[in-house]
Design a protein with these regions (language model features):
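Long, contiguous interaction/recruitment modules in multidomain scaffold/adaptor proteins
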Residues: 1-12, 24, 142-149
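TPR-adjacent "capping" and linker segments in tetratricopeptide-repeat scaffold/adaptor proteins
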Residues: 1-12, 35-40, 127, 132
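Alpha-helical adaptor scaffolds
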Residues: 14-22, 27-79
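Canonical tetratricopeptide repeat
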Residues: 48-50, 83, 116-117
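Alpha-helical repeat scaffolds
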Residues: 61-71, 98-102, 130-140
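Mid-chain, well-packed structural core segment of small domains
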Residues: 69-96
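TPR/TPR-like (Sel1-like) alpha-helical repeat modules
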Residues: 89-125, 138-139
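Long, ordered, amphipathic alpha-helical scaffolds
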Residues: 122, 127-129, 148
């Protein structure tokens, strides 16, 4: 994350805001992001602010618009996908959130994206739990079960 901060200490509000967001203190983060000068707002910071708006103010339309704008400005940063997905989740759009997380993983396999997608996935139990998931027997029987049930 050090690439988005100025070396002369001007990025401290941004650093503290991102840290507060990741620790779950979105109210403090939103307050910190509102103090950041518009010229210092990168797409990443804008996406974090959008997530804070969604969780604290419940203004989902504004948060989605802001996060989508951030993604359009920088499609290469996986944390922007993470924050857009979080906004979709907060708004109740689970399917859109999972699609966004998957797009972010295609961009870069970031651990936070992987963890979030894994926590949302809804895989069924394996037919033969004593075998590995990749075992052909589990795969074939699993596919048969999915067509029957």
């Amino acid at each position: 994350m050090t690439g988005i901060f100025n070396q002369d200490g001007e990025g401290t509000l941004v650093e503290e805001g991102i840290k507060a967001t990741e620790e779950g203190n979105t109210r403090l983060a939103l307050n910190l992001f509102s103090q950041v000068k518009p010229a210092e707002m990168s797409p990443l910071v804008t996406s974090y602010q959008a997530y804070c708006i969604a969780t604290e103010q419940k203004n989902f339309r504004k948060a989605m618009d802001q996060a989508i704008d951030a993604l359009q400005a920088d499609r290469s940063h996986p944390l922007i996908y993470l924050n857009l997905g979080r906004v979709f989740l907060a708004a109740g759009y689970r399917k859109k959130a999972m699609q966004t997380f998957r797009k972010g993983i295609r961009c870069q396999r970031h651990p936070l994206l992987l963890r979030k997608l894994e926590s949302l996935s809804n895989r069924r139990a394996m037919p033969f739990p004593f075998l590995q998931r990749s075992n052909p027997l589990n795969i074939i029987v699993g596919k048969l079960f999915s067509k029957v049930f």
